[in-house]
Amino acid sequence: MSLTLWSGVNPENARTHKLLAAAALANVAVTLKACEYGRENETAEYCRNCSPCGRYPVLQTEEGCVFESNAILRHIARLDRSGGFLYGRTPLEGSQVDMWLDFSATELDAASEPFVHHAFRGEPLPANAMDRVHEVLRALEAWLETRTFLVGERMTVADVAVAFALQWHYRLNGAEGEALTKKYRNAYRMYNTVMQQPKTVEVLRSQGATFGAREGGAKGQGRGCARPGREEAERAAAAADGAEEEDEAPREKKKPNPLDELPPSPFVLDAFKREYSNTDTRTVAAPYFFQHYDAAGYTTFWCRYKYNEDNKMQFMTANLIRGWFQRMEHVRKYAFGVALIIGEERRHDIVALWVFRGRGMPAIVEDVEDTELFDWEEVADVAAQRERITDYLSWEGPTIPRPVLEGRVFK
C-alpha cells in the first residue's frame, strides 16, 4: 500500500502536521511530497483527479485521491495498524469521532479564521471575534469536564483534529492565547495530551514546527520576527483555506538526552520498579528503596497540586492524574512516581512522591506542561523521611494527613 501526501510544507502548516501525526500514531506509512502552490495544483489534471478546487493537502493512494484534511484523517484512521482504535471501537464511537471532526472544522476553525486573516493578511479583527472563541471553548470545556478524551477511553483522531485546531487559538490570539489555556484547562489538558505524544513531537520537530505563541505576523501578534512580505503573507493566508505553499523545512537532528550520559548508578530504577510491582511494599519494596537509593544519581521530590480547591469530583481528579501521567510517558525511563488523592469525595487533594534520575529537576520534566501546576519540594535527606516516604509508597500511614481515596503509580 502506497500513500503519498501532497502538500505545501511549512512550520505553520497545522493541517499537514495533523495528518502526519495521525499517520505516525496509526503506524501508517505516508510519504510527504512537497509541492509549490500555484504550480501542480493549478493544472487541469490535478483539479480533475486530485482536488477540484486545486487545493492542498491531497492524499494519493493506489486506488485514487482523497482531498480535504479531515477526509484524509478519516482514511488514515480506517487504516490504523496501531491497535489503538483511532476511529473508535464501535459504530457509535466511529460516528462520535465524525461529529468531533466536524466540530473541529465548523466550530474551532471557523472561530479562529478572523485571527488567521489578521495575522497573515493584516485584516482588522471584528469586535466580537473573541466572543465566538469563548462560546466554542466553553462548549468543549464542558464536554471534557467528565472525560479524558473526546470519544471513549482512548485517544482517537477526534482528539488529534481538535488539538491541532486549538493550536491556532493558543498561538494567534495574542495575549488572549495564554489566557485561554488557563481559563479552559480541560481543553488545554486534552491539547497537551495529543501534542506531547512522542510520535507527535517527533513529527513536529521533523517538519521544523514552531511552538508557543506565534512570532511575527501582524502587529501585536508576536515579537522577535519581522512581518512576512506580501507574497509570503498571501501564501500563508491560503493556509486558512487549505492551500498552503511553503519551503521544505530542514530536519532537526535528535539530540542526546543528558540523563543517558550520566555515570552509572548503583540504584537501578527498573530493579526497584520490579520490586515495587511484585513484592510487599512495607516489608520488601520500601526497604529495598532505602538500601539502594543513590543520592548522587537521583533526586526525590514531594509535590502538591496548586489548584486542589477545584477538585470536586473524584473520578474527574483521577482523570486529571491519568492525563498527567500520559503526558509524562517519555520520562518513564528516568522516573518513578506515586500520586494519591486524599480527603473526601467532593473535597480532596492531589499529592505525590517522585524520584527522578540525576540531580535536581530534569529538563524533560520541566518541559511537561503539568509540572507548573504543582508545587515541588526537593527531599534533602531521603533517610530522614523514611517513614513518610514508606507511607506514600504504601498508600497508607500516619504521615499522610487525610484518608487515601485512590492512587496511581508511574513506573
Curated annotation (Swiss-Prot):
Probably plays a role in anchoring the complex to other cellular components. Pfam families: EF1G, GST_C, GST_N. Keywords: Elongation factor, Protein biosynthesis. Residues 3-84 form the GST N-terminal domain. Residues 90-216 form the GST C-terminal domain. This is Elongation factor 1-gamma. GO terms for molecular function: translation elongation factor activity. InterPro entries: EF-GSTs, EF1B_G_C, EF1B_G_C_sf, Glutathione-S-Trfase_C-like, Glutathione-S-Trfase_C_sf, Glutathione_S-Trfase, Glutathione_S-Trfase_N, GST_C. PROSITE patterns: EF1G_C (PS50040), GST_CTER (PS50405), GST_NTER (PS50404). Residues 212-265 are annotated as: Disordered. Residues 255-411 form the EF-1-gamma C-terminal domain. It comes from the Eukaryota. Residues 214-223 have a biased composition (Gly residues). It comes from Trypanosoma cruzi. GO terms for cellular component: cytoplasm; nucleus.
